[in-house]
From Swiss-Prot:
The lineage of its organism: Bacteria, Bacillati, Bacillota, Clostridia, Eubacteriales. InterPro entries: Mur-like_cat_sf (IPR036565), Mur_ligase_C (IPR004101), Mur_ligase_C_dom_sf (IPR036615), Mur_ligase_cen (IPR013221), Mur_ligase_N (IPR000713), MurCDEF_pg_biosynth (IPR050061), UDP-N-AcMur_Ala_ligase_MurC (IPR005758). Its EC number is 6.3.2.8. It is found in: Cytoplasm. Pfam families: Mur_ligase, Mur_ligase_C, Mur_ligase_M. This is UDP-N-acetylmuramate--L-alanine ligase. The keyword Cytoplasm applies. Belongs to the MurCDEF family. The gene is murC. ATP binds at G118, T119, H120, G121, K122, T123, T124.
Length: 457
């Protein structure tokens, strides 16, 4: 089934799970274009209220009665097949599209589509790029996977040909997109509940590169061997970046006491500009270089690049400062893959703290099982680890893996690690063991953030 943003203006569109990060942005784009939009969600939220104010009809709870006078129904992979609205849509032969397919159709209505892909860093980099595009007055439409202060949420509807979005590889979603510029930040083994192995993942990224038209661009991280291998299939223009390799590089890197970098940006041997970031970590130096690459493609001037990147203070849940209590700093981070955790702890180590006490909640049984050995080795930079039970998310516990097994292996590896089995137990432990000057770092994509929030109360 196809959907044309420009031609199908009379079609009424219903979103199942309209309050979700990805769905709400799509609904907002349609509302701005003049569509009649409805949607359902399990609970009321700031997002559903915002969409209601913009003209959407919002239903709380899922029911077949919600599909009144509807032509198109959009759903996400998280919606089960026995959802009453899915069943009703099939019975009535309505156009039924998943989120990725629908987003791809919306992208067709824009000329300069930017799709930010990679295993790690998509939300942060999409946010950086959005800051630069807004600084340059490109008036872009933006869909980002987290709240971004400058756009007061997770989406912005612009009135130009520029469209900026994250491109998730899970279940090959991004192969439904129509990018003019693709960005690949990195490639690692993840989502192994869907992918067979790293070669399957690389093959999917190669398909993503082949989506880009010959006059388009692929931007890739030259410090990542797997990314460079994938770029070999490109028929479009190729622009690379990196700390140590690539067309665009960072040199003379220095970090301040907050772990934020100042550095010079070179294209080959020509100095383009100097940057001072307000987000910490070497990985964010790398992420910012991809934004510079995009700025080069769209002829954005140096002042707009500097202004955009220096004004970016981070996306929510990405090394987010939560508060300080008794001279103990609390930071929350979304990292849930061993590579991300290592980068987060490396960033924390550059800051001026006494000890780093990390509370980690593994995310999904599949990821914990398939990346077990990597998880064992990724906590070397913390002084103490508090390990919570696995957050199931979309999965069921088959009894194959648990946090106690992971904790035993981490302790055998030489890291001080304590297993806890609830937020209250985690809070009790950190209250008893934190000292002045320590950093409490909550890490994970589930609800581990509650530990830090409870501590600050």
């Amino acid at each position: 089934m196809s959907f044309d943003l420009l031609k199908d203006i009379n079609k009424k569109v219903h979103f199942i799970g309209i309050g979700g990060v990805s769905m709400s942005g799509l609904a907002a784009v349609l509302l701005n274009a003049g569509y009649k939009v409805s949607g359902s969600d399990s609970k009321e939220s700031e997002i559903t209220n915002r969409l209601k104010e913009e003209g959407a009809k919002i239903y709380i709870g899922h029911s077949k009665d919600n599909l009144q006078d509807v032509d198109v129904v959009v759903y996400t992979a998280a919606i089960p097949s026995d959802n009453p609205e899915i069943i009703k849509a099939k019975e009535d032969n309505l156009i039924l599209m998943d989120r990725a397919e629908f987003l791809g159709q919306i992208m067709k209505g824009h000329k300069f589509n930017v799709a930010v892909a990679g295993t790690h860093g998509k939300t942060t980099t999409t946010s950086m790029i959005s800051h630069v595009a807004l600084s340059a007055d490109l008036d872009p439409t933006i869909l980002v996977g987290g709240d971004l202060d400058i756009i007061h949420g997770n989406f912005r509807v612009g009135n130009s040909e520029y469209f900026i979005t994250e491109a998730c590889e899970y279940k090959q979603s991004f192969l439904r997109f129509f990018p003019y510029v693709g960005i690949i930040l990195n490639i690692d083994a993840d989502h192994l509940d869907f992918y067979k192995d790293i070669n399957h993942i690389k093959d999917t990224f190669k398909q993503f590169v082949r989506l880009i038209p010959n006059d388009g661009y692929i931007i890739g991280n030259a410090d990542d061997e797997k990314v460079m291998e994938v770029l070999e299939v490109a028929k479009c223009n190729v622009l690379t970046y990196g700390i140590n390799n690539g067309d665009i590089q960072a040199r003379n890197i220095e970090f301040n006491e907050k772990g934020c970098a100042t550095f010079d940006v070179f294209r080959n041997e020509e100095k383009l500009l100097s940057l001072s970031l307000n987000v910490p970590g070497m990985h964010n130096v790398s992420n910012s270089l991809s934004a510079v690459c995009l700025a080069e493609i769209f002829n954005i001037n140096a002042d707009s690049i500097v202004s955009g990147l220096s004004s970016f203070g981070g996306a929510h849940k990405r090394f987010e400062y939560k508060g300080t209590k008794n001279d103990i700093t609390v930071i929350d981070d979304y990292a849930h893959h061993p590579v991300e955790i290592k980068a987060t702890l490396s960033t924390a180590k550059k800051m001026n703290h006494n000890r780093i006490v990390c509370v980690f909640q593994p995310h999904t049984y599949t990821r914990t099982k398939t990346l077990f050995n990597d998880f064992v080795k990724c906590f070397d930079d913390c002084d103490e680890l508090v390990l919570m039970d696995i957050y199931a998310a979309r999965e069921k516990d088959l009894g194959e893996i648990n946090s106690d097994q992971l904790g035993d292996a981490i302790r055998a590896h030489g890291v001080k690690c304590t297993n806890v089995h609830s937020h209250e137990e985690a809070l009790e432990y950190v209250n008893a063991n934190l000292s002045k000057g320590d950093l409490l770092l909550t890490v994970g994509a589930g609800d581990v953030v509650k530990v830090g929030e409870l501590f600050l109360k």
